[in-house]
Amino acid sequence: MVALSNALSRVFGSVAGYKFPSFIQKGINALYAKIFKVDLSEFEPLENYKSLNALFTRSLKKERPFDKAPNICIAPCDALITECAFLDNDSALQIKGMPYKAHELVGEINPLSPSFFYVNFYLSPKDYHHYHAPCDLEILETRYFAGKLLPVNKPSLHKNKNLFVGNERVALVTKDIQGNRLYFVAVGALNVGKMRFNFDKNIQTNAKARFTQTYSYNPPIKVKKGDNLGNFEMGSTIVLFVQNTAFKDLKEKSVKFGESIGEFHAN
């Protein structure tokens, strides 16, 4: 199953990256936009994308404004928030009734503290696929975990136990403005050709190699709130684990990158 789902995603990625003649590509783009109800009001028009992958990975025409105050945490992406809560004995939910162990997702040996609040951001095929820093961060490590590429939509989350932990994923181990640990996890999914990270081009995802790899940074890589960290090549999921932060009532709400979603407490 692992080989099949990953092979299918590689094939889809190759097809999506193919540049058809312009009149054909325009029709493909228009069909995709119609099926998934893609809103291009902040983006270039459909005819400007030379491949389906170019449409998936489209960039904003203008920078979105966001609160620059250092104590404000912003949404890192355009997404639906499917679950959010404090960890309960190291347990988080991929969806209601489907728990998993947080330390396994991020690659720690010991359970995570109950002071961590987690937020699941589901990026659908219609969404802007880039992900950004939710606050000023120092990136200490990037951990790549090989795995399956199962869908991360709600039916699949209800059906497959430990889906996030079993799927291919990349966990950024970072330090926030207060010096607390913050985990930023990008979870792969079916038909997500690759996950890309702008701060380290060595990170390879959806490759044929089946191993875990750690990239350490000394000194740490410093990024500012709102910086573009990378992108999916179709919809998928971001999971944030944050400490000492008061979040708004977010569950089942759609958010946009740059929207204020929480506030850091003083340590």
Curated annotation (Swiss-Prot):
Primary residence: membrane
A UniProt-annotated Pfam family: PS_Dcarbxylase
Enzyme Commission (EC) number: 4.1.1.65
Cofactor(s) the protein requires to work: pyruvate
GO molecular function: phosphatidylserine decarboxylase activity
Site note Cleavage (non-hydrolytic), residues: G235, S236
Membrane-topology annotation of the record: Peripheral membrane protein
Function (record text): Catalyzes the formation of phosphatidylethanolamine (PtdEtn) from phosphatidylserine (PtdSer).
Entries under NCBIfam families matching the protein: PRK03934.1, PS_decarb
HAMAP family (UniProt xref): PS_decarb_PSD_B_type1 (MF_00662)
Quaternary structure and interacting proteins, as annotated: Heterodimer of a large membrane-associated beta subunit and a small pyruvoyl-containing alpha subunit.
Protein name in the entry: Phosphatidylserine decarboxylase proenzyme
Species this protein is from: Helicobacter pylori (strain P12)
Lineage: Bacteria, Pseudomonadati, Campylobacterota, Epsilonproteobacteria, Campylobacterales
Gene: psd
